[in-house]
């Protein structure tokens, strides 16, 4: 679980820093009462990429630490990681209100296809990590 949480925190921080960069360096519009703002919206296509890279790296670290990793363990790990992420996201980004929280519609409808691609990336991260252990 340690590797999952480290990856999750890193991906979240990268997304936040990317948004801040867009707002302050590229002078994109920040969030307002109507939307999350241009600075955030322009980061969305990058979110699956952050996730596939980071979760593959941490999937590799996790799988490489096992005495005899198998592809079945990689699939199980991917399923566990994406399940935890889905549940945590509901609380962390929708239910618990904060300046960057979203509504259910914003997170699960308007964030398409990105959220689906993110969850696929998290699922396959340990699988790709396992494949890297074979090299």
Task: Say what each PLM segment does.
Residues 1-80, 84-135:
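Juxtamembrane/disordered regions of integral membrane proteins
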